[in-house]
């Protein structure tokens, strides 16, 4: 039979690791690039866009559609990095257990 006190200590330890991982993710920054670096998006671990950098060569009316696409690609690239880091950080906090694909933490 499993010792209840030992189980409780493990649960508390896991909870502490989860809180630490959440804080680490909330403070992290992820850079997504598109068009060979012509567009760069910096997003927080919460998925909020912090900064968008656009090369001046794209600031022409005839480049509008391409610019919109590059911003989308750069943001998605930053979001993918955030999601991967989140999975890895939380897996460590959960002693190697993997979260289901697409699972999002509430932060």
Swiss-Prot record:
Keyword presence, Flavoprotein: no
Keywords in alphabetical order: Cytoplasm, DNA-binding
Primary localization class, coarse: cytoplasm
GO CC term (a single one): cytosol
InterPro entries on file: YbaB-like_sf, YbaB/EbfC
Coiled-coil regions, chain positions: none
Pfam families linked to this entry: YbaB_DNA_bd
Protein location: Cytoplasm, Nucleoid
GO terms of molecular function: DNA binding
Keyword Hydrolase: no
Reported function: Binds to DNA and alters its conformation. May be involved in regulation of gene expression, nucleoid organization and DNA protection.
Family membership: Belongs to the YbaB/EbfC family.
Subunit-structure text: Homodimer.
Name of the protein in question: Nucleoid-associated protein A1G_07310
Organism this protein belongs to: Rickettsia rickettsii (strain Sheila Smith)
């Amino acid at each position: 039979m499993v010792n209840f006190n030992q189980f409780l200590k493990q649960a508390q330890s896991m909870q502490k690791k989860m809180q630490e991982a959440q804080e680490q993710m909330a403070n992290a920054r992820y850079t997504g690039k598109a068009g060979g670096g012509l567009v760069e998006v910096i997003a927080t671990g919460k998925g909020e866009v912090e900064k968008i950098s656009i090369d001046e060569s794209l600031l022409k009316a005839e480049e509008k559609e391409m610019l919109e696409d590059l911003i989308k690609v750069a943001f998605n690239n930053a979001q993918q990095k955030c999601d991967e880091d989140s999975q890895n950080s939380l897996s460590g906090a959960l002693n190697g257990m993997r979260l289901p694909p697409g699972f999002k933490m509430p932060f």
